[in-house]
């Protein structure tokens, strides 16, 4: 899978970064714990987490008593989640969901940008097929209202010399709001969007 080498490098630093210790990414993850807590509080019943990473959201879901299954493609991320947080994150990703029984909620946080633009529709379709008829998909991720908004951010953070962040903004497959609306509409689904910080949006998709 693409980005696996990035995951290997990112894994040891991930928790520190999302908790604000890396100045370059601080704005990306403002209110990180609150955003994850909202996902964990909203998701009920049987919950699948895709792109669990080091298990931060998984842990919150379990603490709230949710029946949660979690998957991630990165050996390094899963090792941190399973060995240091006593979780059971299994191998899987957006196109490889190793469970047959449908879920009431599927949640994913800061992972959907690893899906190529031309594959996002199929990824959403795959996830929706793994939901119950009244199930919901929650996607929390960096998204952009327009190309201009994204380029303005890149210019601003280049001026701050946050070059790792701006490289990510130019190389990862971040979703544009209008494109997501088009995908959801073409699939005959419903979409609700709420902005959570300068970068993050929460998309709720239902049948």
Curated annotation (Swiss-Prot):
EC number: 2.1.1.-
Gene Ontology annotations of biological process type: methylation
Domain of life: Bacteria
Residues reported to bind S-adenosyl-L-methionine: 51, 72
Pfam families noted in UniProt: Methyltransf_25
Entry's Gene Ontology molecular function annotations: S-adenosylmethionine-dependent methyltransferase activity
Annotated SUPFAM superfamilies: S-adenosyl-L-methionine-dependent methyltransferases
InterPro entries, A to Z: Methyltransf_25, SAM-dependent_MTases_sf, Uncharacterised_MeTfrase_YrrT
Keywords tagged on the record: Methyltransferase, S-adenosyl-L-methionine, Transferase
The protein's role, per its UniProt record: Could be a S-adenosyl-L-methionine-dependent methyltransferase.
PANTHER family: TRANS-ACONITATE 2-METHYLTRANSFERASE, TRANS-ACONITATE 2-METHYLTRANSFERASE-RELATED
Protein name, UniProt field: Uncharacterized methyltransferase Sca_1399
């Amino acid at each position: 899978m693409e980005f696996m080498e990035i995951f290997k490098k990112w894994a040891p630093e991930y928790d520190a970064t999302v908790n604000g210790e890396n100045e370059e990414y601080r704005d990306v993850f403002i209110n990180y714990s609150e955003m994850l807590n909202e996902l964990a509080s909203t998701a009920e019943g049987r919950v699948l987490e895709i792109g669990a990473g080091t298990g931060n959201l998984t842990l919150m879901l379990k603490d709230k008593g949710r029946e949660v299954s979690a998957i991630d493609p990165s050996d390094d991320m899963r090792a941190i989640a399973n060995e240091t947080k006593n979780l059971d994150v299994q191998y899987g990703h957006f196109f490889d969901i190793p469970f047959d029984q449908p879920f009431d909620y599927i949640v994913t946080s800061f992972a959907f940008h690893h899906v190529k633009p031309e594959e996002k529709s199929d990824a959403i379709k795959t996830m929706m097929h793994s939901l119950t008829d009244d199930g919901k998909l929650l996607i929390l991720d960096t998204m952009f209202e327009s190309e201009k908004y994204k380029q303005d951010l890149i210019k601003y953070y280049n001026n701050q010399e946050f070059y790792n962040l701006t490289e990510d903004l130019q190389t990862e497959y971040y979703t544009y709001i209008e494109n997501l609306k088009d995908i959801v509409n073409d699939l005959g689904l419903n979409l609700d969007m709420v902005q959570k910080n300068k970068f993050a949006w929460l998309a709720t998709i239902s049948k």
